[in-house]
């Protein structure tokens, strides 16, 4: 193990439809992008993302599919031994949200009882199709949800912090320094961010619809 290498490491699988921004998201973390490794047998890039917490450094080895999800499901080898996961959809594309239950099903079939965060990416785009009130899957399955914008770094650290608290078992765990991130390609409009945060809060306090439908 290299000098100063974090002792605590977790395999994190990043799943969701092609084109939802998974690779853009993981590439924001500059050291992880610099040190990524390609696993040819599975067609996967593994990005080592280190975060410094008040409990020491932790590393997520983030498995990114390199686009093969466009050709159907992923092989079980991708999921095996995953300790946590992020499922991503694109808030400007309803079909990517409709497919979230399929990704969740594939994931929990191989990895039972791992902490999972659902992320709605591209919230910087004004023409949002999947609104806060229609994002209910995470509430039915006890997942955490965050609006994110990979290109503006908006909420980049939130999924990793929530997962770290679950994995370490410390609800008071905090990041003590932010990792070096690629400069924002676009700026998130603060008033839009505030509106979305308000919408999510309202949605979270609204009773779930009764229907048994998965969405």
Curated annotation (Swiss-Prot):
Its cofactor is Mg(2+). GO terms for cellular component: cytosol; nuclear envelope; nucleus. The record marks 68 as: Essential for GTP hydrolysis. Its EC number is 3.6.5.-. It is found in: Nucleus; Nucleus envelope; Cytoplasm, Cytosol; Cytoplasm. Residues 210-215 are annotated as: Interaction with RANBP1. Coiled coil: none annotated. GTP binds at residues 17-24, 35-41, 67, 121-124, 149-151. CDD domains: Ran. Residues 36-44 are annotated as: Switch-I. GO terms for biological process: GTP metabolic process; mitotic sister chromatid segregation; protein import into nucleus; ribosomal subunit export from nucleus; snRNA import into nucleus. GO terms for molecular function: GTP binding; GTPase activity; magnesium ion binding. Residues 6-170 form the Small GTPase Ran-type domain. Its main location: nucleus. Mg(2+) interacts primarily with the phosphate groups of the bound guanine nucleotide. The keyword Hydrolase applies. It catalyses: GTP + H2O = GDP + phosphate + H(+). Residues 67-83 are annotated as: Switch-II. It comes from the Eukaryota. Belongs to the small GTPase superfamily. Ran family. NCBIfam families: small_GTP. Monomer. Interacts with RANGAP1, which promotes RAN-mediated GTP hydrolysis. Interacts with KPNB1. Interaction with KPNB1 inhibits RANGAP1-mediated stimulation of GTPase activity. Interacts with RCC1 which promotes the exchange of RAN-bound GDP by GTP. Interaction with KPNB1 inhibits RCC1-mediated exchange of RAN-bound GDP by GTP. Interacts (GTP-bound form) with TNPO1; the interaction is direct. Interacts (GTP-bound form) with TNPO3; the interaction is direct. Interacts with KPNB1 and with TNPO1; both inhibit RAN GTPase activity. GTPase involved in nucleocytoplasmic transport, participating both to the import and the export from the nucleus of proteins and RNAs. Switches between a cytoplasmic GDP- and a nuclear GTP-bound state by nucleotide exchange and GTP hydrolysis. Nuclear import receptors such as importin beta bind their substrates only in the absence of GTP-bound RAN and release them upon direct interaction with GTP-bound RAN, while export receptors behave in the opposite way. This is GTP-binding nuclear protein Ran. It comes from Salmo salar. The gene is ran.
